[in-house]
Amino acid sequence: MVSLRDNIEVQPLSHNKRVRKNFGHINLVADIPNLIEIQKNSYEKNFLQLDTKDSERKNKGLQSILNSIFPISDPSNIANLEFVKYEFDTPKYDVEECTQRSLSYDSALKVTLRLSIWDIDEDTGSREIKGIKEQQVYMGNIPLMTKNGTFIINGTERVVVSQMHRSPGVFFYHDEGKVHSSRKLLYSARVIPYRGSWLDLEFDAKDIIYFRIDRKRKLYATTLLKAIGMSTEEIIKFYYDSVNYKVVKNKGWAVKFMPSHITAHRLTSDLIDADTGNVLLKAGQKITPRLAKKYAGEGLNNILVSHEALIGKYLSEDLKDPESDEILAKIGEMITVELLSVISDLKIKNISVLVINPQSGPYIRNTLFSDKNQDRESALFDIFRVLRPGEPANIEAAESLFYNLFFDPERYDLSEVGRIKMNSRLELNISDETTVLTTDDIKNILRVLVELKDRKGIIDDIDHLGNRRVRSVGELIENQFRIGLVRMEKSVVERMSAGDIDTVMPHDLVNSKILVSVVKEFFSTSQLSQFMDQTNPLSEITHKRRLSALGPGGLSRDRAGFEVRDVHPTHYGRICPIETPEGQNIGLINSMATYARINKHGFIESPYRKVKDGHVTDEVVYLSAIEEGKYKIGQANSKVDKDGILQGEFINCRVEGGNFVMVEPHEVDFIDVTPMQVVSVAASLIPFLENDDANRALMGSNMQRQAVPLIKTDAPFVGTGVEGVVAKDSGASVLALNDGIVEQVDSNRIVIRAIGQKTESAPSVDIYNLLKFQKSNHNTCINQKPLVKVGHYVKKNDIIADGPSTDNGEIALGRNVLVAFLPWNGYNFEDSILISERIVKEDVFTSVHIEEFEVIARDTRLGPEEITRDIPNVSEEALRHLDEVGIIYVGAEVKAGDILVGKVTPKSESPITPEEKLLRAIFGEKAFDVKDSSLHVPSGVSGTVVEVRVFSRRGVEKDQRAIAIEKQQIEKLAKDRDDELEIIEHFVFSWLEKLLVGQVSINGPKTVKTGQTITSEILKGLSKGQLWQFTVEDANVMNEIEQLKGHYDGKKEALNKRFATKVEKLQSGDDLPQGALKVVKVFIATKHKLQPGDKMAGRHGNKGVISRIVPEEDMPFLEDGTVVDIVLNPLGLPSRMNIGQVLETHLGWASVNLAKKIAGLVEEHKTKHASIEKIKKFLIELYGENINHILEKSDEEIISFCNEAAKGVYFATPVFDGAKVEDVKDMLRLAGQDLSGQVKLIDGRTGEYFDRLVTVGQKYLLKLHHLVDNKIHSRSIGPYSLVTQQPLGGKSHFGGQRFGEMECWALQAYGAAYTLQEMLTVKSDDVNGRIKIYDSIVRGENNFESGIPESFNVMIKEFRSLCLNVKLEVTS
């Protein structure tokens, strides 16, 4: 290990950063937000509010639930339990320890509760406080989130996926004419609360309006209006306007002329001005709204209508006899011929009728007259009977039920979002705090529904992202917490009523198990709490950014239609239109777009640049789908001059509804931040995505997530510029916590001295222990490698170590290989891939996979199981890898069947034969009363043991191996402590010497006289302890020395304390499951080389299986002798339409040849001492402006940069803003290659040129998780299914290959009768036949006799279950 002391030159880490030639034209004004902040913000900031003081916590998340559940009172109101505050303990184990010990990473929730007890005077009923007790109560352990946004539950890393669900609020829609045979549109409205009962209002085919609660039996909508306290008159007045008809003697009725109510139609009678008597239009002539407005403008106020025109109109008030006040007809009744004659007989002069016409139908009036309920009471009874059928109804119960349904905040919650949505849809102005329904809401929902039926307004689009919101981790767990606390509340009330309340403390009332079990159940069994996809860093990030429409309260994949799954215009910049699974979940599981974020209401927002009067500013505004509809938004690639002014006469803009319009520059409100904001992280890693077909791009994004981390990582030559961001945010790489200087580096850890603090205080030291060969969730290997050297100066958040699938701080999922597109003897037929032996020989695509095997020694009825080397009937050869305790050594090479851990189990006593008695007498007891139950390597696994962990139960004596492992870990901790202390001491004492030199000593070590001036020579002769003994004249210096000593002692004490705590944890034994005495875990690493049958893929959805590995000398090669690595079939391109891979290959070819050119220039500089200017000129030509920071450095650094570039020139071609065909040609031209990107290729077998030029270039290929080693499988004998007695299927059940119906046809076609009989009987489910075959094989005979297959017997049994007695009659 190298370590730093002042003689090593400190150099910045920045020159390690990779430079990519970027083809992007659009300046990035906004950085990609942290890719996993969606998880961390939701849980840590919004739910737990971990880093917030009690007094400053907002009423959200955990705080809001506790506030809403407490205070809890007992039924007699004597006791009251209030919530004061909550806090979390420090977790007992850190993340790594939890993973190793199979524990959950959690922390104890401590809630301070206050119990107030009151004295109630029985006579007056007045209350006095009797006593107050305040106590901190343990409420169970709550899982904490790791820094990477995951949870550790029982030792496995899990992710809680965010859920997309319908936003609370009110929605209006119609059935698209599907329900009624006449294709009539039936409109309906639905109120969806966050929690509580659903309310539906709907039209039927006869235009009567009904309502349902929770999809129960329907009732008339007016019953609901009456239940909220409206009378018939109020209902009619609220929903209808009225108009007055006055009698004109002998002529008819005069009525107000209302042009707004007129539609285009032919008149049935003359249009007469009532004031003048003029006929304006004759019967049969056409009137239009425009003409009506013209007449109104010319002074037409009233028109004359005939007496009969009133027939069929509805009264807008009760019709009374002018003399007797007797009611002749009630409000809302229709005027009939009879009623009209009564009106003329009684000489009634004025009649008020409802305005009902083609624009406003009589639906509510008709419903009202169909409804039998006349008052509120009968309406409430009606509702009660539907919801509680069979229960006796009384008015209190009915009122209470109706109130609890929609108006009780404890049972009904629209949530703040629901209220905002409701207000905006119904144009109301109710406070956001009112999260229950109000009477205004119900009245206005019905109003809007009727307006929709009258063709005013539009229905809601439920797939619009303004109507769908995201529930992230915090909110999902908050809902579980609420369920747990509500259950706990019931038990608290019971306990309050049960015991003597005066002696009870708060902790006696609270039962935390109820809460813990709910939270535990959510994390371990919920559909949204998922085993993290940890194949590679990209799959981790994607999993954390996933949005699922499935899960509790969401859709089910069987019922989800096409519309829900489809891409919607509002997905733009919010949800990726590309990345979604193939198969039944397509469109239901999505990925968030790269730049998207989730706002406080759960709606997804996308960033845009503000445009003011045609000038594009750098101000970035995040808009949700609802807000976005109000603006005109231009594309990111709209032409802009250097001053930011939009160019061109018209700009293409998106407007509401996903439509495009051309507008003038000054009308544009926003433009996109970058074209990349449309797609997800995985899709943004595909170069030339714009040249690929969407289906293939989908496969490409999905397959990148299945790429296995390789031993040698290699970032793509042709990237998109996002690689660094993904590697950094994924948590796979190690980031520096503070600015500092690297003190020590080895393969296991990095020690950095943090700088930037006050000089006189002891520096802090950051020690980064790297992960070495750890197993991921998917058995891939997690291994970190340092990137820094001793003496490097690192800044905070610099990448100091690479993780799996990262290379120099960039994500590297595969390797760059030389690819040729040509057919080769049919070996690349149907997407097969031909590879060169070099790929295998040089481990280009070799990966390490780690399997974990566990054995538990339990306490059984017959005695404890024992882990031992002393196993009965096992040869010494089989025990060769085991130590004296019976556990395998680290480093042992094992294959299937080898013993990993020796274990014996006591077996029950059986009767002893005389021979056994004799053997026992001779050889002793031991061998007979135990059976071998050792852990063996399962079939198909071989490799090297890389780690062994031994866990012993508390109180059980540890074995040698456990003690050795523990000692090793303590030594590691001691080394960390000592190194940290050494660095601190070095700087403390050098600072102390600086302070002392030149000071006059008053007091000090014996060798130094009083009054002597201290020099560095004097100090060299003293020990470190003696330096603290000095007292000097200068009081200020003395003060500084004392401060320094205080800092030093504090740091030293903290270090020792931390060390002691960790050692105590190691030595204290482990919490093992019930009955387990000892657990041993063995990790075996297997190297998987590439072989035929392995699946490989590119980034463009081009996938294939390796068909053959060809010797290097037989592969095609270039004119300079370079052998092609991989041969792909050119026919895989045209029909798939993923042309991006061809452009990638061409640019990769340019990259290799540019690298050769740079290498040539460097060689020329070295050997011929050519001027460095030539190199600089070439670099400027290649990289353009973004190379200036390199060119300003020294010649050595430029040459060092060129040496790196000589391995391959790296390009970045951002999605939708990348290299065009011309740019690719420019690079090929600069590299001195043919612009077609094709070369002459020579056949390795014949040595002759191929007839045509071949496309060759560097292409980035991935090795996918579908390895042939894990799939290939065979069986000779094995388990059989219980009922059918046929062999099981599948590798996991050690099953057979099914010889199915079609295979039987094949044998029938060939007439292979005996083979067929064998297949259907003795090789399958003829039990007796199987036994006979076995017998004849043992005896060495060739007899074959088949019986009746078991499946036939099963069929007969099924017949019998149908009461058909079928018997098989066997004739001899």
Swiss-Prot record:
This is DNA-directed RNA polymerase subunit beta. Its EC number is 2.7.7.6. Transmembrane segments: none annotated. PROSITE patterns: RNA_POL_BETA. The gene is rpoB. The keyword Transferase applies. Keywords: DNA-directed RNA polymerase, Nucleotidyltransferase, Transcription, Transferase. GO terms for biological process: DNA-templated transcription. GO terms for cellular component: DNA-directed RNA polymerase complex. The keyword Nucleotide-binding does not apply. GO terms for molecular function: DNA binding; DNA-directed RNA polymerase activity; ribonucleoside binding. The RNAP catalytic core consists of 2 alpha, 1 beta, 1 beta' and 1 omega subunit. When a sigma factor is associated with the core the holoenzyme is formed, which can initiate transcription. Belongs to the RNA polymerase beta chain family. DNA-dependent RNA polymerase catalyzes the transcription of DNA into RNA using the four ribonucleoside triphosphates as substrates. It catalyses: RNA(n) + a ribonucleoside 5'-triphosphate = RNA(n+1) + diphosphate.
